[in-house]
Amino acid sequence: MDSQRNLLVIALLFVSFMIWQAWEQDKNPQPQAQQTTQTTTTAAGSAADQGVPASGQGKLISVKTDVLDLTINTRGGDVEQALLPAYPKELNSTQPFQLLETSPQFIYQAQSGLTGRDGPDNPANGPRPLYNVEKDAYVLAEGQNELQVPMTYTDAAGNTFTKTFVLKRGDYAVNVNYNVQNAGEKPLEISSFGQLKQSITLPPHLDTGSSNFALHTFRGAAYSTPDEKYEKYKFDTIADNENLNISSKGGWVAMLQQYFATAWIPHNDGTNNFYTANLGNGIAAIGYKSQPVLVQPGQTGAMNSTLWVGPEIQDKMAAVAPHLDLTVDYGWLWFISQPLFKLLKWIHSFVGNWGFSIIIITFIVRGIMYPLTKAQYTSMAKMRMLQPKIQAMRERLGDDKQRISQEMMALYKAEKVNPLGGCFPLLIQMPIFLALYYMLMGSVELRQAPFALWIHDLSAQDPYYILPILMGVTMFFIQKMSPTTVTDPMQQKIMTFMPVIFTVFFLWFPSGLVLYYIVSNLVTIIQQQLIYRGLEKRGLHSREKKKS
């Protein structure tokens, strides 16, 4: 095998990847667009008995920190809107990214409350509680590190329920604390719940998966338990009423999309029921319900949970709850993407530019792989040296394929040549390439990350297609500099057009990925020349002009 055939192997692997991508798209098609009727109804009559009545109309209050802009409905205390000021909606946009939304076209809310026999959110006890608040807007002031938003409700029996949102500067984790004061003569049986509900179908203005070459990251529900660290739950499964219903001590429930996530993390000593539900009107939900606790007469009970609402920043998510960082969707190559990202982030802490970090990590990867690359070129050189003997063997043995195969293997053994030695480095490079692809499309740190000049977003395609063209040029030079034993006219034609074909494919790839491939090709050219000089000294390579 020589460098020309290497390109054929790469092309085969690449085409296989594209076919797999298309199959994934066909296997998990996006639901047909449909209008979602605005509603605040939550799961009713589900397997977990997680019934909550319609919210009705409450007052909307604004809660702002340096990183969160929330809108909370005083009817039930649900978070109906979440804006992320640190993350623009689009490149060069002044509008913040909206994670939670309540509109006629799209529903995505973080709901929570107190159910159980005596809970104010129990449908049997009437409408959801209408909380009282001191003001309509809460803002984290300069020099202030914590913002508390207390909401109180007193039922007909005189029992007081206080729901307090606690937000901290620079933090996407919101603590939701409940305080129950029993003013009656009987114990109160209370359970807490947290629920995330979302329209299954994305409206056109939110659906960004328009490119057939884009990597479609997971969008749906997920959960974690001590037994199952991370499990995805598809919206389609919920829509088919195949719902989750398990008990867990600890863990979390979440809804995921590219770069961003919401999650409820309950904090209690008992068990929680994790569930999903099809709420109708094209809305799916995932949530938890805690084990009931008793609040004795004249006593006060407390329940706590945490809501994560923001970007998938792995180290911060891991600090909030075990395994919450696994929500970053690195696909089936996560075991390569995760350490690759950690190394990339470490490099970025020194250079301050993600593009230069990609360049440096490319040099590191190719440096580590240099012994394999050298072995690859040495193996190919030995194979070329054996070609006259192999050709003479074929002429001598004619059509006796069995004897040809036997004598070729004996020749390889005698000359200490591995006929597959040229393939192994390629089989390693391809997973690294794909892992980098997953990393670019799954790491929020690389979303809208600029490099230099015209590249303002390494996770998006090059707007002027300059990088893909440069990549094609580097492939052309590698091809021209590589000796070949390809004699078949059809293979020669394919090899001639290979740089052009790859250039076309790479037009739609993230510019960070194309940058990696360009630098990798440039390193290949340098390593190739160094290796050829060593092979010349051993008589395994000559500098004669390559035949076209």
UniProtKB/Swiss-Prot annotation:
<feature type="topological domain" description="Periplasmic">
    <location>
        <begin position="447"/>
        <end position="463"/>
    </location>
</feature>
<dbReference type="GO" id="GO:0051205">
    <property type="term" value="P:protein insertion into membrane"/>
</dbReference>
<feature type="transmembrane region" description="Helical">
    <location>
        <begin position="6"/>
        <end position="23"/>
    </location>
</feature>
<dbReference type="InterPro" id="IPR038221">
    <property type="entry name" value="YidC_periplasmic_sf"/>
</dbReference>
<feature type="region of interest" description="Interaction with SecF; not required for insertion of a number of Sec-dependent or Sec-independent substrates">
    <location>
        <begin position="215"/>
        <end position="265"/>
    </location>
</feature>
<feature type="region of interest" description="Required for Sec-dependent and Sec-independent protein insertion">
    <location>
        <begin position="265"/>
        <end position="346"/>
    </location>
</feature>
<keyword id="KW-0813">Transport</keyword>
<comment type="subunit">
    <text>Interacts with SecD and SecF. Component of the SecDF-YajC complex, a heterotetrameric translocase complex. The SecDF-YidC-YajC translocase forms a supercomplex with SecYEG, called the holo-translocon (HTL). The stoichiometry of the super complex may be SecYEG:YidC:SecDF 4:3:1, YajC is in the reconstituted complex (with SecDF) but as no antibody is available it could not be quantified. Specifically interacts with transmembrane segments of nascent integral membrane proteins during membrane integration. Found in 3 different complexes in inner membrane preparations.</text>
</comment>
<feature type="compositionally biased region" description="Low complexity">
    <location>
        <begin position="30"/>
        <end position="50"/>
    </location>
</feature>
<dbReference type="InterPro" id="IPR028053">
    <property type="entry name" value="Membr_insert_YidC_N"/>
</dbReference>
<feature type="topological domain" description="Periplasmic">
    <location>
        <begin position="510"/>
        <end position="512"/>
    </location>
</feature>
<dbReference type="Pfam" id="PF14849">
    <property type="entry name" value="YidC_periplas"/>
</dbReference>
<feature type="transmembrane region" description="Helical">
    <location>
        <begin position="464"/>
        <end position="481"/>
    </location>
</feature>
<dbReference type="GO" id="GO:0006457">
    <property type="term" value="P:protein folding"/>
</dbReference>
<dbReference type="GO" id="GO:0065003">
    <property type="term" value="P:protein-containing complex assembly"/>
</dbReference>
<feature type="transmembrane region" description="Helical">
    <location>
        <begin position="513"/>
        <end position="535"/>
    </location>
</feature>
<feature type="topological domain" description="Cytoplasmic">
    <location>
        <begin position="1"/>
        <end position="5"/>
    </location>
</feature>
<keyword id="KW-0997">Cell inner membrane</keyword>
<dbReference type="GO" id="GO:0032978">
    <property type="term" value="P:protein insertion into membrane from inner side"/>
</dbReference>
<keyword id="KW-0811">Translocation</keyword>
<dbReference type="Pfam" id="PF02096">
    <property type="entry name" value="60KD_IMP"/>
</dbReference>
<feature type="topological domain" description="Cytoplasmic">
    <location>
        <begin position="482"/>
        <end position="493"/>
    </location>
</feature>
<keyword id="KW-0472">Membrane</keyword>
<comment type="similarity">
    <text>Belongs to the OXA1/ALB3/YidC family. Type 1 subfamily.</text>
</comment>
<feature type="topological domain" description="Cytoplasmic">
    <location>
        <begin position="536"/>
        <end position="548"/>
    </location>
</feature>
<feature type="region of interest" description="Can be removed without causing lethality, dispensible for M13 procoat processing">
    <location>
        <begin position="24"/>
        <end position="264"/>
    </location>
</feature>
<keyword id="KW-0143">Chaperone</keyword>
<feature type="region of interest" description="Can be removed without causing lethality, dispensible for M13 procoat processing">
    <location>
        <begin position="527"/>
        <end position="548"/>
    </location>
</feature>
<feature type="region of interest" description="Disordered">
    <location>
        <begin position="28"/>
        <end position="55"/>
    </location>
</feature>
<comment type="function">
    <text>Inner membrane protein required for the insertion and/or proper folding and/or complex formation of integral inner membrane proteins. Involved in integration of membrane proteins that insert dependently and independently of the Sec translocase complex, as well as at least 2 lipoproteins. Its own insertion requires SRP and is Sec translocase-dependent. Essential for the integration of Sec-dependent subunit a of the F(0)ATP synthase, FtsQ and SecE proteins and for Sec-independent subunit c of the F(0)ATP synthase, M13 phage procoat and the N-terminus of leader peptidase Lep.</text>
</comment>
<dbReference type="InterPro" id="IPR001708">
    <property type="entry name" value="YidC/ALB3/OXA1/COX18"/>
</dbReference>
<protein>
    <recommendedName>
        <fullName>Membrane protein insertase YidC</fullName>
    </recommendedName>
</protein>
<feature type="topological domain" description="Periplasmic">
    <location>
        <begin position="24"/>
        <end position="342"/>
    </location>
</feature>
<dbReference type="GO" id="GO:0043952">
    <property type="term" value="P:protein transport by the Sec complex"/>
</dbReference>
<keyword id="KW-1003">Cell membrane</keyword>
<dbReference type="InterPro" id="IPR028055">
    <property type="entry name" value="YidC/Oxa/ALB_C"/>
</dbReference>
<dbReference type="InterPro" id="IPR019998">
    <property type="entry name" value="Membr_insert_YidC"/>
</dbReference>
<dbReference type="InterPro" id="IPR047196">
    <property type="entry name" value="YidC_ALB_C"/>
</dbReference>
<dbReference type="GO" id="GO:0032977">
    <property type="term" value="F:membrane insertase activity"/>
</dbReference>
<keyword id="KW-0653">Protein transport</keyword>
<feature type="transmembrane region" description="Helical">
    <location>
        <begin position="417"/>
        <end position="446"/>
    </location>
</feature>
<feature type="topological domain" description="Cytoplasmic">
    <location>
        <begin position="371"/>
        <end position="416"/>
    </location>
</feature>
